[in-house]
Amino acid sequence: MEELKLNTIEEAIADFREGKFVIVVDDEDRENEGDLIVAAEKITPEQVNFMLKHARGVLCAPITISRCKELELPHQVDTNTSVLGTPFTVTVDKLEGCSTGVSIHDRAATIRALADPTSTPETFGRPGHVNPLYAQDKGVLRRAGHTEACIDMARLAGLYPAAALMEIMSEDGTMARLPELRKMADEWGLKLISIRDLIAYRLKQESLVEKGVEVDMPTEYGHFRLIPFRQKSNGLEHIAIIKGDIKEGEPVLVRVHSSCATGDIFGSMRCDCGEQLHKALQMIEKEGKGAVVYLNQEGRGIGLMEKMKAYKLQENGVDTVEANILLGHQADERDYGVGAQILRSIGVTQMRLLTNNPVKRVGLESYGLSIVENVPIEITPNKYNERYLKTKKDRMGHTLHFNK
């Protein structure tokens, strides 16, 4: 990416503030696509026309979750099964001053109205021709997507947190990717940035966690150091368990482990969580250096109460993924941004990651951390967790090799 001469985030913010387009590209391990984005409050009919003529994707309008609630815009579907969980709301058109909602004038007016604090639910007709999107709170530090990048750019520019975006297609109808996006940006006179760089910019500007006091912690697996961290946004407390002297830039063995009270504490055989945690500590002790980041994200981020509801559904025949979806959650709602900042805080920027989960790798790499090796951490299945592990392999892409 460096060879393609991406623009700086500061340059892009300045243009975005003036109402100019910016091209944003995401990670190769995600969509690896470029989106044309512009501030919602600044958009003109001519810009809508440019997007339709040159980008040719789907016209969307990212707004905050709180704004969606204010405007009474529910999710487009109750169960989101799209590949990346794209959070569409019902489609809308601005009613007053518009006709069918299709014209460039009408669509620009609708997008501007989404960014108008005086707009109410009655401002819009449903369905319409603009696709609002729910943007996750905390922006790209929560979800490394174009939707969140739009909201972050608006906030960094001092504008209302709403934008318009459209995916950029090549002439042959395939998705435009680097280096073609660089050529397009040069041809159109636009700034080109990456979500990875936007994440790095925010991580330098903001602190997500408060670091606690470090203590020694002898365990049955070896002697470690423990540092607690408090997440500023919600008060959740996380833990870093460290072995040895970690030097910045040195690839060390790392396990990012989400809390599982049933498995980690009570030894539940319905999952492999506790065994993975204990095995990770043993491996790090044997290595003589490394860290476990223990995140307070029970049930893949849905909490203990919801996890128990999911367990009950599983007892009635659904699998772990279906259970989450039936309860209105995504299959995996974990936030790796806070884990990435904890790792940076203890000096880890390169790691040999203990995981079977490809999403975890992508999640951490999206925050500028380098994973030099994936180290498997497989557990022998038992009769209680056999189906759970098979679901993780078949439906969540986990790298598991048991034959059950």
Curated annotation (Swiss-Prot):
Binding site for Mg(2+) 2: 31, 146
Pfam families the record matches: DHBP_synthase (PF00926), GTP_cyclohydro2 (PF00925)
Entry keyword set: GTP-binding, Hydrolase, Lyase, Magnesium, Manganese, Metal-binding, Multifunctional enzyme, Nucleotide-binding, Riboflavin biosynthesis, Zinc
Region (DHBP synthase) residue spans: 1-204
Residues annotated to bind Zn(2+): 260, 271, 273
Cofactor list: Mg(2+); Mn(2+); Zn(2+)
Pathway the protein takes part in: Cofactor biosynthesis; riboflavin biosynthesis; 2-hydroxy-3-oxobutyl phosphate from D-ribulose 5-phosphate: step 1/1; Cofactor biosynthesis; riboflavin biosynthesis; 5-amino-6-(D-ribitylamino)uracil from GTP: step 1/4
Residues the record marks as active site: 332, 334
Identification of the protein by name: Riboflavin biosynthesis protein RibBA
Species whose genome carries this gene: Phocaeicola vulgatus (strain ATCC 8482 / DSM 1447 / JCM 5826 / CCUG 4940 / NBRC 14291 / NCTC 11154)
Gene encoding the protein: ribBA
